[in-house]
Each structure stands twice: as C-alpha cells, then as structure tokens.
UniProtKB/Swiss-Prot annotation:
GO terms for biological process: L-tryptophan biosynthetic process. It comes from Methanothermobacter marburgensis (strain ATCC BAA-927 / DSM 2133 / JCM 14651 / NBRC 100331 / OCM 82 / Marburg) (Methanobacterium thermoautotrophicum). Residues 4-196 form the Glutamine amidotransferase type-1 domain. It catalyses: chorismate + L-glutamine = anthranilate + pyruvate + L-glutamate + H(+). Pfam families: GATase. Its EC number is 4.1.3.27. Part of a heterotetrameric complex that catalyzes the two-step biosynthesis of anthranilate, an intermediate in the biosynthesis of L-tryptophan. In the first step, the glutamine-binding beta subunit (TrpG) of anthranilate synthase (AS) provides the glutamine amidotransferase activity which generates ammonia as a substrate that, along with chorismate, is used in the second step, catalyzed by the large alpha subunit of AS (TrpE) to produce anthranilate. In the absence of TrpG, TrpE can synthesize anthranilate directly from chorismate and high concentrations of ammonia. L-glutamine binds at G60, P61, G62, Q93, S138, L139. This is Anthranilate synthase component 2. GO terms for molecular function: anthranilate synthase activity. The keyword Electron transport does not apply. CDD domains: GATase1_Anthranilate_Synthase (cd01743). GO terms for cellular component: cytosol. The gene is trpG. Gene3D superfamilies: 3.40.50.880.
Length: 196
C-alpha cells in the first residue's frame, strides 16, 4: 500500500479547501502524499494502481445515486473498504446509499451553522460535544432508512444525520463541511481521520 491520500473531486469548490487542510495536517505528521482526481477522469483500475492508503470523497453538486454526479465513487467505496474512507457531504450521502441507505430531499441548508451532537467515537476524539459545523446540502440521509451495517455517529437538533460510520469497515461520512471556517473543530476531525 502506498502512503498516498487520494481525494476524489466531485466537481466542488470545497475540494481545494479539503486538499489544503489535509496537506497541512500531513506536513505536520511528516507523512504521505496527497493527490486529487476528478470523479470522471480516472477509472477503478487507475485507482487500484495508485493503491492509496486513505481516500477522501469530496462534496459536490447533484445526487450520489446518479453516476454522472458521483462518477467512480461508488466503485471506489466497494473496492477499498479495507482502508479508511471519509465521505464529505455528497461523499457522505454516497457512502450511506452504497450500503443500502435512503437518501432524500430535505429543506435546503446553504451556509447554515448548526450544533452537532456526536457519540464520542474515534472520528470525534477530543472534539467538544456539541460542536458547531457548517452545512451546505439539499439532500440528506434519511433516519428511517439507516442500513444495518451503518451507525449514526452524529446528528443535528433538527434530526439530520450529520455523521456515520460502518460497523465493520473504517468507512466514515460527514454531512457537514470540516474544511469550512464555520466548523472550528473540523481540522481536529480531519486529523483524527488521517491518523487512523
């Protein structure tokens, strides 16, 4: 396995912020390279050849159910469950959907800061409970459709699922944006993921 952090870009402007934050953390850890690829510019064989140590699936517009919006991300989730994967916003919804969850439309929230209550699991180590996080989404993971293999790790007061993790695999999702300045503990959460 390569010491590579692979970020799959779902054509979102926040991807650059994720890349920058992850790069700063990795420099402090004196470890790993980071590479960004667009979700439709590579195939699964290319990703296999990279043999990444960890994968981040970025936010993006659209719906994770549609291949034209989510590209190779579903294939990557299925292929690399043996190593840490973090999905952010669209990536989070895509992970939830891949494992059998229901993703539906909710009231759009764009730039809204919410309190997030978490379960203290490894992704939230050292993070206050609750903490404040920035949300940009019109889709959400439905509470009535949580798959058996998925645990809800965090939620907002309005009931929106804000974080998930797989029961067996090191696969995680965040509905909120850890890379946003409006998520003061987002860097801590991303660092927890990168240190797993």
């Amino acid at each position: 396995m390569n010491k590579l952090i692979l970020i799959i870009d779902n054509y979102d402007s926040f991807t650059h912020n994720l890349y920058q934050m992850a790069g700063e953390i990795m420099m402090e850890m004196d470890s790993a390279d980071i590479m960004v690829v667009r979700n439709d510019e590579v195939d699964i064989d290319y990703v296999r050849g990279l043999d990444p140590e960890r994968i981040i699936i970025s936010p993006g517009p659209g719906n994770p159910i549609k291949r034209e919006d989510f590209g190779i991300c579903s294939e990557v989730i299925g292929e690399f469950t043996d190593r840490p994967i973090l999905g952010v916003c669209l990536g989070h919804q895509g992970i939830f959907h891949y494992f059998g969850g229901v993703v539906g439309y909710g009231e759009p929230v764009h730039g809204k800061i919410s309190e997030v209550f978490h379960d203290g699991s490894e992704l939230f180590r050292g993070v206050p409970n609750p903490f404040r996080a920035t949300r940009y989404h019109s889709l959400r993971c439905e509470c009535s459709g949580v798959p058996e293999d998925i645990l809800v790790s965090a939620s907002a007061p309005d009931g929106t699922i804000m974080a998930i993790r797989h029961r067996q695999y090191p696969v995680y999702g965040l509905q909120f944006h850890p890379e946003s300045a409006g998520t003061p503990h987002g860097r801590d959460i991303l660092e927890n993921f990168l240190r797993m």
